[in-house]
A protein has these predicted regions:
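Short, intrinsically disordered, charge-balanced linker/junction segments flanking boundaries
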Residues: 1, 56-59, 156, 236-240
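N-terminal accessory nucleic-acid engagement/regulatory domains that precede
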Residues: 1-46
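Pre-Walker A (Motif I) flank of P-loop NTPase domains
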Residues: 82-88, 113-115, 163-165, 229-232
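Conserved SF1/SF2 helicase motif Ia
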Residues: 89-94, 99-140, 144, 221-229
Length: 240
């Protein structure tokens, strides 16, 4: 089953929910086969796992930004492509969005996976989805209270059908059974917490669902019955 999905020409094809239910470890098999570098000279590794080639192909940039001589963008993007969890602190306007969007779009093509981005502001989610669309990238959607019923249904359908590789939601959306069922039906490759300082700034007595994020990820992992290896998490902030 894993080889059949990997060999599909349409990267938007998804693993059927019945297959995920009956063979939950198929997600790990796909991730292992598609994300494990093999030997030097491998065409697949050069094209699917190289962050520089991904940056050029997807966004049209030749190089990542550096800060005080440090390649922070590249380091964060590479760590995500390698399947690691990470915390990254970037200066305001420092281009942190591309460091999680790039690995998410690469994973969407390589493993047919979905990256869930948890963001505090509806306007911020819309801006990021719109900015990607302006670049011709239609792989991102948002589900939030600004959508009318038709727009919400379309967004949910795009995620369920595999047309979306990035889903932007607020932490409150994790309480929704619709969202929970939706995420159960997809191969979740990573959770991204944007503006991660909200954990401590807000999570105690304002927007307490920030404190629910960890519980939800553990619950999802348990219900998916994949293995003991946790779903990777990336935390990004401009405020440490």
């Amino acid at each position: 089953y894993a080889l059949a999905l990997i060999g599909c020409d349409d990267y938007r094809s998804t693993t059927p929910p019945w297959l995920l239910y009956n063979f939950p470890k198929i997600e790990n098999v796909i991730k292992f086969l598609c994300n494990t570098p093999c030997a030097d000279g491998c065409d697949y590794c050069r094209n699917a796992l190289d962050v520089h080639k991904g940056l050029k192909k997807i966004f049209g940039f030749d190089n990542f930004r550096t800060y005080n001589g440090e390649p922070l963008q590249e380091m964060a993007a590479r760590a995500a492509v390698e399947g690691k969890s990470l915390l990254a602190v970037f200066p305001t306007g420092g281009g942190k969005s591309i460091t999680f969007q790039l690995p998410a779009l690469m994973a969407g093509k390589a493993t047919h996976g979905l990256t869930v981005v948890i963001s505090p502001l509806q306007s911020l989610m819309k801006d990021q989805v719109d900015n990607l669309a302006e670049k011709g990238i239609e792989d991102a959607v948002t589900v939030n209270g600004m959508l009318n019923p038709i727009e919400r249904a379309d967004a949910l359908d795009r995620v369920a059908s595999g047309k979306a590789s990035i889903l932007y939601i607020s932490p409150e959306q994790l309480r929704s059974k619709t969202i929970e069922r939706l995420l159960m039906s997809r191969n979740i490759v990573r959770f991204v917490i944007d503006e991660a300082h909200c954990f401590s700034a807000w999570g105690q007595d304002f927007r307490v669902d920030y404190l629910y994020i960890g519980d939800f990820i553990r619950k999802l992992q348990k219900e998916k019955k994949t293995d003991k290896k946790p779903i990777p998490v990336s935390c990004f902030t401009a405020t440490a």
